[in-house]
Amino acid sequence: DEQTRILGVKGASQECDCDFVGSGDTVIDPILLTWYKDTYVMDPVEKRGFDGNLWRWEYPAANGSYMVVADVARGDGSDYSACHVIEVTNATQVAEYKGKVDTKDFGNFLVNLSTEYNDALLVVENSNIGWACIQQCIDRDYKNLFYMSKDLKYVDVEHQMKNKYRADEKQMVAGFSTTSKTRPLIISKLDEYFREKAVTIRSNRLIDELFTFIFMNGRAEAMKSYNDDLVMALCIGLWVRDTALRLRQEGIDLTKRTLGGISSNQQYEGVYGGSNMDDNPWKMKIGDDIEDLTQWL
């Protein structure tokens, strides 16, 4: 039914039937993950960075549209800071980072990476220590930082830092907020993309995380002693791509359709145009008669 199409079999069972998936059941079907691993996963063409943990599969194309999506480590040493570079048009993973790095250094790294990929839309998860990373991006005056409203009514994907003090933007916050409201949405979006095979994943590290990304007491999270940093960054990226960027594109398309509906050869009735004008500009049809305007000169 419609709920199954939107949320997936597992999501619909939890949402509609209160049938919470048993602990240990993976969020993404392992058979599907194996298909992805056999079909798309490949070694990166380059490994670079101070720790060699930036993996790249594609270099930035001249006219490519990209987004960089990051999940910042909590700072307790048990997880990693991670990010993906996603080609927006085809939802293709072109680069990935996973490592342990200071939040300020990670902020600088994200700005540099986003700039390299054609000033990509930079989306940073802003919970907890993520704010320190975002502040570094703001201090660097990065112009394409993602903002969203606190109540999630809308997102502003074209927000410029020079406008950050405008009164009508006081409720805008930098970064993406993973809350009890947004978390089910982004995980559902992850499941949807994989079920429809609408995203191209190159990273073996990410697929390995997805194999251990399970339902535990009704909540999707990493299995004990494993991490889900790459998974959560991808969840956010797919939601932003499918929601915020799609809405912006629909607005652009609507503008094009509106402008295209305006005809340039329409004739309007009036003093200086329309059917009351004769071929001779000095003659005008008045009622049933043609009057010579030169007599008034």
Task: Kindly give the residue locations of the regions a language model identified.
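Surface-exposed intrinsically disordered loops and tails
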Residues: 157-174
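RNase H-like, metal-dependent nuclease domains and their acidic two-metal-ion catalytic environment used
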Residues: 2-150, 158, 180, 184-188, ...
